[in-house]
Amino acid sequence: MTLFRQNSALPNFLDSQRDSFRYFLETGIREELDFFSPIVGQSLGSSSKRPTDRFISVSFHSKDFYFKKPHYTPQEAVQKLGTYKSSLIVPVHVYSKYLNLNATFPVAFCDLPLMTEHGTFILNGSPRVIVHQIVRCPGVYLKPQFDKQGNRTHLVSFLSAYGSWLRFETDKKGVVFAHIDNLRKVPVTVFLQALGFSMDTIVGALKYPEALDPTLKEVDWKLTTDEAILLLMSRLFPNRPATVLRGRKFLFNQFFNPRRYSLSDVGRKRVNQKFRMRSKTKHLTLTPQDALAALDYLLRCENGETEFLDDIDHLKNRRARLAGELIQTQFRLGLNRLERVIYNRISDENILRKTPGALGSLNSLIRTQVLASVFQEFFGSNQLSQFMDQTNPLAEITHKRRLSSLGPGGLNRDRAGLIVRGIHPSYYGRICPIETPEGKNAGLVGSIATFTQINKNGFLESPYYKLISESNTPDRNGFFLLSAFYEEDTVVAQGDVDLSNFRIPTRNKSQFTENTVQEINFLGLCPIQFMSIATSLIPFLEHDDANRALMGSNMQRQAVSLLRSERPFVGTGLEAHVTRDIGATIVAKQNSYISYVDAQRIDYFTPVIGDTNLIDYQNLTAEDVFASNQFKHNTIWLTSYQRSNQDTCLNHKPLVEANTWVEAGDCLADNAATAKGELALGRNILIGYMPWEGYNFEDAVLVSERLVYDDVFTSIHISRYEVSTARLREGQEYFTNQVDRNQYLDEFGVVKIGTWVEAGDVLVGKISPQPDSDNDPESRLLRAIFGGVARNTKTTSYCLSSGVSGRILDVRCEFKRQTKNIEDESIESTGSVYVYLVEKRRLQVGDKVAGRHGNKGIVSNILPRVDMPYLQSGKALDMVLNPLGVPSRMNVGQIFECLLGLAANTLKQNFKVLPFDEMHGAEVSRGFVYHYLYKSRLLTQQKWLFKPNSPGKSIVFDGRTGLNFDQPVTVGYPYILKLVHLVDDKIHARSTGPYSLVTQQPLGGRSKKGGQRLGEMEVWALEGFGAAYVLQELLTIKSDDMIGRNRAFMSMIRGTLLPKSGIPESFKVLVSELRGLCLDMSIARINF
C-alpha cells in the first residue's frame, strides 16, 4: 500500500512494460550473472598429480557488463526489415593453473532485442509485443478437495517459482501423506523425520496432535533421521537400492538447492505471512520449519478452522509476469545451458589444447550461440510473444496492456473450467470484467483496468482516496494504491456513491455489503475505475448489456483507419490520453518554435536555458531564434505511408505551420486514426432506425452511395509482396526483365515505383531453369560448348493476383549477385525483392460496419442518394439500421448516442460523457439528451428536432415516392466504424482446386483454395423440398465421387449426357471405419 501525491491518478498506460524491461537491463542481468558465477570445473584428462591443479574457473564480472550501440534505430529496423537489438558484452575471467590461464576478456554473450520507447520489440522489421502473463503466485496454499463419494479432505501445497512441488494431503481415513512431484505418496511423519525432526518435536508443534494418530498407525512412528531417509527412498523408488547418502542428496536437490528450487522473494514473503513465522527467514528455498508449519495448518483445517483456506482465483494469490521478468527467465535458461556447455568442454582437455593462446582457450570454452538460440526461440515462437496488433492505436495500446493466463507455466485453454474463467470480486479496479475475447479464450485473456498499476512484485494495484473520518469526505490531495491483499481487510466504496445516504454499498473480504459512511475506509476515484481503456471509450455504457459492451470493446480494436478521420460527436474524455501514451500523436515536450514543416519532418527550436518563463515569446522573431545560442535545433521525423502488421496504413499528418510558436503539450502531428490529437476511429453519419424493403433484415445495413463517392469510409491498405530466388537442382533462378508483359519493369526486372498495376501484371520478372527432357549426345555437346545457356528455362514471374489493383508505393531490393548479358544488355540478379502496393478501398457490399455498443452489420445494398429516406430538412440519410436490433440485444446506449449526436451536429459542439452518470440522479441520461435536443430546436427554429409527443423521433420521407412513412423514425448522428473484416479479403471462388486425401471433399478456407461443403443442415433443407436429383448430384459427382466427377468433366467437354453417379468417397470411408470396429459391411447393387 503506497500513498501518492499527484494531480492525476491516471497513469501512463505503458509504464508497466517499460519499467519492467528497464529493471531487467539494470538489475536482472546482474542478478543472473552473479547467480551462475563462478563456474568451476575439473579437467578429467590433466596429467597433473595434484587434483587442485586440474580445476578451471570461469567468472562473470556482472558489474562491468555493457551494451553496444544498436546497428539500427527502431525506424531503420522497420524500414530495412531488421531487428532492433544490441550486443551484450560481459567481461569473463578465466583462471587455470595447468593451462597457465589468468586473464579477463570481453565476451559478446548475445544480441538482445531491445524495447522501444513505445513498449514494442522489432524483429525482422515487424513490431512484436510481449503480453503480460498472470499466474499463481509462489507460496503455500490450503484448499479443500473432494473424492468421488463426496468426502471432503484438505490439501496444502507449496508452489515454487521453479523446482519440484510438494503436497500434504489427507485421505478419507485421516491419514496425512506427503506427495513429491509425481512420485509415490509417503506418510508425512516419515517425510518430516527424514528432514531431521524428532517425533516429539513434530507432536509438540501441532495444535491438534491427536489428528496425527491415523498416520502413526501406518508406520513405525519413532525413527531416526537415517532410518526415515531409508524408508522414504524405499517408498519413492522401490526398484532402486536405498542408501542414506542418496536420500540426503535427493532431498537437498529437490528442496534445498538454490540452483534447482526457489520460492522467489514474493513466495518467501507469502509463506512467512501465511505461517506468521517469527524468524522471518529470508531463505528462498524451502526450510524444514515450513513443512512442519504446513502440517499444523492442514490439521487445523481438518478440525474446522476453515479461515486458513485460500481462494486460488483471488488476485492476492495471482501475480503478473511482465516482459522484463519473462525475458529474465529466458536469460536464466540460456545461462543454464551455457553452464552445461562450459562444464562439458572443461572436462575435455583435447578441446582446450587444440586452441593455442588464452583467447583461443576462452573461445573454446564459451559458446554463446546457446544464448542466441534461447532468445530466438522465445521471441519467435513463445505463446506470449505476439505480432503487435496495429490495426489502430486503440488496438495497439490494448495489446500492450493485455493479461493472459495461457503460456508456459499458465493454464491450458482446453482444460480451463468455468470457475477460472469467471469474474472474481477482487477484479474490481484491476482487471476489466467486460473486455475479453469471444470463443475459447473467453475469461483466460483479459485487459488491465484503466487506473491499474503493477507494483514491483507483479501484484495489480488500484488507486483509492482515503476517507477522512472527521468530515466523512475523501482526502483528494493524494490517493493510495491498494493491492487485493490489502484491500481484503478494508471497507471500500465505489467512486459514484452518495455519501449522504445512511447505508452505502461497499466491498469487504470479497463480499458486496452495505455499511455506514463511518465504517468506510477508502473511496474509489471515478465510475470508470473498473473498466479497461477500450470499454471506457463507450459513451452511455451503463445502458448496454454486458455482452454487447464486450463486443463494442473488441470491435473498436478492429476499426481501420479512414482516409479522413473525424472525432466522435459524443466521447468520454479519454480519447486524447490514449493516443499520447501510445505515441500515435506527436506532442511538443516544451515550448518550441516551428521552423520547417513537410510530410517527412518537422524542424523546431527549443530553449536550452532552465527557466523558460524568462523568454519573451511574443516579441521573438524568426531571425532572433536562428541567431540566438539560447535555442537548440531539433528534428522530428514523421511516419509516411508505412505498412503495419495488419496491412493498414501508418501515416502522420502535421497539424502545425512553419514560423509559429507552440506550447508544451500541443499536438504537432496526427496519426491516421486521430483527429486534433484525439482518437478518431470512425465517422459521424446520419442514420435512421427503420425497416427498408428487407435490405436491413437481421444485421444487414443499407447505406447511401454518398459514403462511397465522398470517401467517407474509404481506407488505405498497404500490402507487401516478397519474391526470392533460389538455387535449384537444375541451376540458379534469377531476376530479369526479359519476360512477357514487361512494360512496367526496370532494368533489374522489378516493377517501377509509382506504377499503377492491376490483376495479372508482372511485379517481378523471374526465370527458373527446367530439367532437360532430352539427354541425347547433341544436347550434351551444346551444353559442353555453351555452358548453361542451352538449358531449358521457364518464366516464373510474380504476377498480381486477381481482384487486386493499386499503385506501387515502394520497392526494396536485396541483390546478392548481378551479371550483365552482353547480347541484350539485360541485368540478371539474384536475391530478394520486396514490393509494397498501396490500394484505396471504398465501402462496398459485404463490408462490416459497427457502432461502439456492439451493434454490427454487413452492408447489403448501396442505394443512390436520391432513393434514400430523407428528413424534413431535405437531408438524406446515410445509413438505415434495423430497429429490431436494439430491444432484444439490450444495447440502448446507441440510442442515447444517436440522439445526442444529432444535437451535437446542430449545435456544432462535441460532448464528453463519462459512463454511469446516473449517480447524479434518476434518468439523467435521458434528461441530458432531451435538454440538448430542445436547445438545438430553439437555436435552429426547427421543431422536428424535438417533439414532446415523440421525443427523439421525426417524420421521414421516402426518397423514391416523396411520401412520408407511417411512423416517426429515430434519426441521429452516432459514431460508426468500418471494421477490418473487408469483403475483398474474404470473398473467394474456385472452379477446381485441392481435395482432401481421406474424404476427397474440397478443402476449406480461402488460404487453401477451398470450396463449398454441403453440410447436414443444407442436406436437410433440400430433403425438405424433395429435391432428390439435385441432392444426388451435390452428394456425388459435385462432391466426392471421384470416378463420377471425372466422367462428368469429360462429358461436359465432349457435349454428351452426364453419366450416372457412383459411390461417394466419404461413404467408403464410413465403411472402412465400420470394418475397423470389426463390423463387416459389404456393398451390393440390386437391380429392380
From Swiss-Prot:
Primary localization class, coarse: plastid
SUPFAM superfamilies (UniProt xref): beta and beta-prime subunits of DNA dependent RNA-polymerase (SSF64484)
Pfam families linked: RNA_pol_Rpb2_1, RNA_pol_Rpb2_2, RNA_pol_Rpb2_3, RNA_pol_Rpb2_6, RNA_pol_Rpb2_7
Biological processes, Gene Ontology terms: DNA-templated transcription
Superkingdom field: Eukaryota
Molecular-function GO terms, alphabetical: DNA binding; DNA-directed RNA polymerase activity; ribonucleoside binding
Catalytic reaction(s) noted: RNA(n) + a ribonucleoside 5'-triphosphate = RNA(n+1) + diphosphate
UniProt-listed InterPro entries: DNA-dir_RNA_pol_bsu_ext_1_sf, DNA-dir_RNA_pol_su2, DNA-dir_RNAP_su2_dom, DNA-dir_RNAP_su2_hyb_sf, RNA_pol_bsu_bac, RNA_pol_bsu_CS, RNA_pol_bsu_protrusion, RNA_pol_Rpb2_2
PANTHER family: DNA-DIRECTED RNA POLYMERASE I SUBUNIT 2 (PTHR20856)
Subunit structure: In plastids the minimal PEP RNA polymerase catalytic core is composed of four subunits: alpha, beta, beta', and beta''. When a (nuclear-encoded) sigma factor is associated with the core the holoenzyme is formed, which can initiate transcription.
Family affiliation: Belongs to the RNA polymerase beta chain family.
NCBIfam families in UniProt: PRK00405.1
Name of the protein in question: DNA-directed RNA polymerase subunit beta
Organism from which the protein derives: Ostreococcus tauri
